[in-house]
């Protein structure tokens, strides 16, 4: 091997090693025994490693997750960002809700930051301070309050750095039309793309990672008929103990769009 070839090989290895290490950190976070079993069992539907790689998660980023609920993504993102020198921020509702108590363990999850996100909240953080904003299966809820989803898109745009990423996972109505303001939980891809573009974002890529062709999208209690919610009656009313879940369990979790938007640099 010539000296020139050896030098080129050394440079290529040096370039590749950080990416390999980052992949290893993400794999470790996904495989961690710290994750709840009710979350890991959903990985076959939510494809966390592939989704995060598609969205452009990188070591050392500042990531804001909108409405993380029980922490499906928090269990992965917070340890990963702690290990790679980044920062995880949870954007919760105006009632001051915080993540489950286990996430206070700094040795595992790092120093999780909190901010407020609602239809009347202020900025998510300092302008241009975040590398990535993640919203997973939330937008349909905001559409029931006039102007809320549009406000959200503006908030995300403001907190992101130039070149920053808006990562979206949402129940997909396509190819059938969206029903009104998505009361069944299914949103048309065109609806979200339009809102994001009006806020200034550019749609950079879409993926079928979280597609589910078994989802017929005509369930009696909307998307919540499917796992993991498995409603057996209208939302807010007592369930039907005789409801047959088998058809819906066989479908699995919903068909979802997976989108990556970018704030222009």
Where are these regions (language model features)?
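Conserved beta-strand signature within the Rossmann-like core of class I S-adenosyl-L-methionine
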Residues: 163-171
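C-terminal lobe and adjacent flexible extensions of AdoMet/dcAdoMet transferase-like proteins
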Residues: 243-265
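Helix-to-beta-strand junctions that scaffold the AdoMet/dcAdoMet cofactor pocket
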Residues: 82, 143, 160-161
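Class I SAM-dependent methyltransferase Rossmann-like catalytic core
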Residues: 26-54, 58
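Conserved class I S-adenosyl-L-methionine
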Residues: 60-69
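A short acidic, Gly/Pro-enriched loop at the edge of an enzyme's catalytic core
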Residues: 123-133
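Conserved Class I S-adenosyl-L-methionine
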Residues: 179-205
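A short glycine-rich, Lys/Arg-flanked "PGG" loop and its adjoining helix->strand segment in the class I
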Residues: 149-162
